Amino acid sequence: MEKKSLACLSFLLLVLFVAQEIVVSEANTCENLAGSYKGVCFGGCDRHCRTQEGAISGRCRDDFRCWCTKNC
């Protein structure tokens, strides 16, 4: 019984450690409004951010504007 408890606790600590590392790695990006994207954002935002703004990715948000994700 004690071995099961120790194994379960070790697994839980490993999961928490990995989850913390994921949060830290995601925190190295910033999302900014695309500077040269014109018009309402329905599509093509990702391609625009990658090619024109030098960003990692782009997405249309709820406000129908193009937001680019860059390394901070």
Curated annotation (Swiss-Prot):
Keywords: Antimicrobial, Disulfide bond, Fungicide, Pathogenesis-related protein, Plant defense, Secreted, Signal. It holds the Pfam family Gamma-thionin. Its main location: secreted. SMART domains: Knot1. The keyword Methyltransferase does not apply. Induction: Upon contact with the plant pathogen fungus Fusarium solani. GO terms for cellular component: extracellular region. It is found in: Secreted. It comes from the Eukaryota. Belongs to the DEFL family. This is Defensin-like protein 230. It comes from Pisum sativum. The gene is PI230.
